[in-house]
Design a protein with these regions (language model features):
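Conserved ABC transporter NBD signature motif
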Residues: 59-67
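Conserved coupling/switch loops of ABC nucleotide-binding domains, chiefly the family-specific signature
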Residues: 57-60, 110, 210, 242
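ABC ATPase nucleotide-binding domains
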Residues: 73-79, 83, 87-230
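Glycine/charge-rich catalytic "coupling/switch" loops of P-loop NTPases
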Residues: 224, 253, 257-299
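The feature captures the beta-strand-to-loop junction immediately N-terminal to the Walker
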Residues: 36-38
Length: 299
């Protein structure tokens, strides 16, 4: 059964260096949740703390109501998919998928039934007798995902699983992963630095930088309503303009270089004050017209 994840005041240190400081996070049951950010932002470190592969210097981690800080990784009932696939080279596809089931000493008929189920679900049934060296990268990733799901984990953790695939195969596999996650309904935590990938597969995304969560939201919210300049420039493409916010008769106006002024009706009430600002304008919001019309003259 899938479980929600709750993290409160997490701290991770390597020696005297603090990587993650006082981080709190809630991931809903059955949600596809992505940790997104540049290299070194702490996203994989946080994932490994959830998995139990990294020590926890502070804070509390929960699967449902169960605190997991001191639970051995093997007993957390997680499925893990790594960026290098980590399938066993000395086992064929069927034995790789069945590995976790055999480790749990399940009855032989149940092992056979669940192995067959996930071979078919991942569309690798025809490769059941094939060795890993005879599989493509995409096929190996399907095997890794089938093996992770076959044990019926409470949580599925995925650490940049598509980074070693070519561009075309990445698009194909991200669609497969999202479809399978929807079908199975398992709580999934996905790590990537690729914002396009994150936007395509996620229910919600946490944008991270320097060990802190900058913003959590749906892909649409992050794109249209970024909470700060980092999120605005990291998600998609944007044009950043310097300006001033001026309040006149309780209305907000954005003043730009050249004396242009625009009425802005989306400013939060607690931000209605004169201040220096940066305006983020997405490319698709710009309209090129032959004749003059409403808006700002760009050229």
């Amino acid at each position: 059964m899938s479980k929600y994840i709750k993290i409160r005041n997490a701290v991770k240190k390597y020696g005297d260096q603090t990587i993650i400081s006082n981080l709190s996070l809630d991931i809903k049951e059955g949600e596809f949740f992505t940790l997104l950010g540049p290299s070194g932002c702490g996203k994989t470190t946080l994932l490994r703390m959830i998995a139990g592969f990294n020590s926890i210097e502070g804070g509390d981690f929960y699967f449902g109501e169960t605190r997991i800080n001191d639970i051995d990784p093997a007993k957390r009932n997680i499925g893990m998919v790594f960026q290098n696939y980590a399938i066993f080279p000395n086992m064929n596809v069927e034995k790789n998928v069945a590995f976790g089931l055999k480790n749990r000493k399940l009855p032989k008929d149940e092992i056979k039934s669940k192995t067959d189920e996930f071979l078919k679900l991942m569309k690798i049934d025809e490769y059941r007798d094939r060795m890993p060296e005879r599989l493509s990268g995409g096929q190996q990733q399907r095997v890794a995902l089938a093996r992770a799901l076959a044990i019926t984990p409470d949580v599925l953790l995925m650490d940049e699983p598509l980074c070693n695939l070519d561009a075309k195969l990445r698009v194909e596999m991200r669609n497969v992963i999202k479809q399978i996650q929807n079908n199975v309904g398992i709580t999934t935590v996905y790590v990537t630095h690729d914002q396009e990938e994150a936007m395509a597969v996620s229910d919600r995304i946490a944008v991270m930088n320097h060990g802190d969560i900058q913003q959590i939201g749906t892909p649409k919210v992050l794109y249209q309503r970024p909470t700060n300049l980092f999120v605005a420039t990291f998600i998609g493409h944007t044009n950043v303009l310097d300006g001033k916010l001026c309040i006149k008769n309780n209305k907000a106006y954005l003043q730009l270089a050249g004396g242009y002024e625009v009425l802005v009706d989306s400013i939060k009430e607690d931000e209605l004050k004169d201040q220096v600002v940066k305006a983020s304008i997405r490319p698709e919001e710009l309209i090129v017209k032959k004749d003059n019309g409403d808006g700002l003259k760009a050229i």
